[in-house]
Amino acid sequence: MLLNQVMNKITKIIEFPFVVLKMQIKQNECQSLKDNIKLAQLRISAPKCFDRDFEYPWVLRNIDIKKGKLLDIGSTVGQMLHDVLPKDIEINTLNINNQKDVEGVKQIEGDIRKTDFKSNLFDCITCISTLEHIGVEGRYGVKKDEFGDTKAMKEMFRILKPGGKLYLTVPYGAKDVLPINKLYNKKRTEKLFKGYKLVKEEYLKYDKRYGIWLTVPEKEAAKTVWQKDKWYSLGLFVLQK
């Protein structure tokens, strides 16, 4: 086991400059070399079992409508939602970039901070690890907007039907790692959730000693330091209008 650990570390050291070079050439996330180095350092130490492996099943388990309109924000999972959820649910996706066509999914290019949707339109909204990027300059070509996430939450509230639910996941922890991710804590979420009813909250934290994710109390998740703990924690919320 010790030999495997040493070999893994050596492999990561060898791979690192090539990972950075690929990111710098593509520039599909960060634009500056400094930021791409930071992102590569974080990615190399990322858990084998990634946060999306928990977020997607969590969202699918908790969605409780059988029919109606669903909107997925920052979507990369329109196909999965269409394939897994009841067929009487109309799947809509919203993304600031062009999306690959998905049969049976209505795709809209736009910004969740300000949309053309009518008020009280959607029965539920999913926003999976997207809120933390809104208005954070330096990644995905986003322009700085200090209150971008607040604007997004207000717009989602506007377009949700009364009684409709928002299924939201965000990185959780003690300190932002900009421009990679904004991290949330109780103080931030309480401001963002103003007007919503908090129906459910869960927190997951990566245990670097054993390489597993654990369900933890909010206070434990809030103490997470990304670089020290090898990854951020996750906050998973069900909110109702």
Please provide the spans of the model-predicted regions.
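Conserved beta-strand signature within the Rossmann-like core of class I S-adenosyl-L-methionine
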Residues: 163-171
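A short glycine-rich, Lys/Arg-flanked "PGG" loop and its adjoining helix->strand segment in the class I
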Residues: 143-162
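Class I SAM-dependent methyltransferase Rossmann-like catalytic core
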Residues: 8-64
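A short acidic, Gly/Pro-enriched loop at the edge of an enzyme's catalytic core
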Residues: 113-126
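Core SAM-dependent methyltransferase catalytic element
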Residues: 214-241
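Short alpha-helix
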Residues: 181-203
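A short beta-strand submotif of the Rossmann-like class I SAM-dependent methyltransferase core
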Residues: 124-130, 136
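Class I SAM-dependent methyltransferase SAM/SAH-binding core
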Residues: 69-114
